[in-house]
């Protein structure tokens, strides 16, 4: 076997076989071609690898965005389906215990509306008087000796009268407040100050009497009742003092006569007593007006 192998090698590396081998230039050309092919293959592999890497990077970025979006959508659904209904139930449960009844709400609204002090304007107070004057016409004016226009009369009454503001509150009226209001109304009247004074030179004005509201009439009546009671008490005291001093003749108490102008029977004792009571009443009325101006209250 060894002999056969050596014989083959000798044949292969013999001089004749060596001549048949290619030249070295042709070998170098083949090497260049092989290197170019290898470079092209490597370049194609690198280009493909770069493309794969870029696509993988974009895929990973999109995957991260999709995950974040999925989390946001899940959170939104959880808030809409779980959190908001739970919060609504909790708030309804809490407010149901604190919610007042309908009667309580109506009572509170009524208290708020009634406890607000309001001022009534003069235009509202004179609206009925203007309608009454327009309905009556000129007969209403000539019956009281008036020939001027109703608009001028309304303006004069608005300037002359000063109504006190009152509040629409329940149980706000008391005897002292009524007395104070009556004193203010008597002070606001033009002919109320010198009604019982005989020595005054001013003439009473009665043009504004028809424009006064009904409340003033009731207050003036109470004031007249109070003055009559005071007059009766003063007269009884004067009679007792006159009996003690000897001004009145007789043992029994005499009945006080009227103060009318027709009573012209000369009685010296009664005249003196009347003069004294008139002076006392005048002083009392002056003190009443001063107290009404200063804001004092009489018991």
Swiss-Prot record:
What keywords sit in the KW lines?
Phosphoprotein
Write down which residues bear the modification named Phosphoserine.
264
The source's domain of life comes to: Eukaryota
InterPro entries per record: FAM228
Compositional bias, Basic and acidic residues, is annotated for: 146-159
- According to the record, the segments passing through the membrane are none
- According to the UniProt record, where is the region Disordered? 135-201
Disulfide bond entries: none
**Family of the protein in this entry:** Belongs to the FAM228 family.
The identity of this protein, by name, is Protein FAM228A
What species does this protein belong to?
A: Mus musculus
């Amino acid at each position: 076997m060894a002999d056969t192998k050596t014989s083959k090698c000798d044949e292969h590396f013999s001089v004749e076989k060596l001549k048949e081998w290619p030249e070295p230039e042709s070998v170098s050309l083949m090497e260049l071609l092989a290197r170019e092919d290898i470079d092209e293959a490597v370049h194609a592999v690198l280009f493909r690898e770069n493309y794969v890497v870029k696509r993988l990077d974009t895929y990973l970025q999109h995957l991260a965005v999709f995950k974040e979006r999925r989390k946001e959508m899940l959170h939104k659904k959880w808030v809409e389906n779980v959190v908001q209904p739970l919060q609504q139930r909790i708030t309804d449960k809490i407010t149901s215990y604190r919610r007042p009844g309908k009667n309580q709400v109506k009572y509170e609204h009524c208290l708020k509306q009634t406890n607000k002090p309001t001022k009534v304007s003069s235009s509202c107070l004179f609206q009925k008087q203007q309608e009454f004057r327009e309905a009556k016409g000129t007969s209403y004016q000539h019956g009281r000796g008036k020939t001027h226009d109703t608009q001028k009369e309304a303006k004069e009454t608005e300037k002359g009268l000063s109504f006190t503001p009152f509040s629409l509150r329940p149980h706000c009226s008391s005897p002292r407040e009524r007395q104070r209001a009556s004193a203010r109304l008597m002070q606001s009247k033009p002919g109320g100050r010198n009604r019982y004074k005989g020595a005054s030179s001013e003439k009473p004005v009665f043009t504004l009497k028809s424009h006064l509201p009904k409340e003033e009439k009731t207050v003036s009546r109470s004031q007249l009742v109070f003055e009559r009671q005071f007059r009766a008490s003063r007269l009884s005291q004067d009679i007792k003092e006159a009996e003690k001093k000897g001004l009145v003749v007789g043992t029994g108490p005499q009945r006080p006569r009227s103060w009318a102008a027709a009573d012209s029977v000369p009685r010296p004792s009664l005249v003196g007593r009347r003069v004294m009571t008139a002076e006392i009443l005048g002083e009392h009325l002056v003190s009443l007006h001063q107290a009404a101006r200063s804001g004092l209250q009489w018991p």
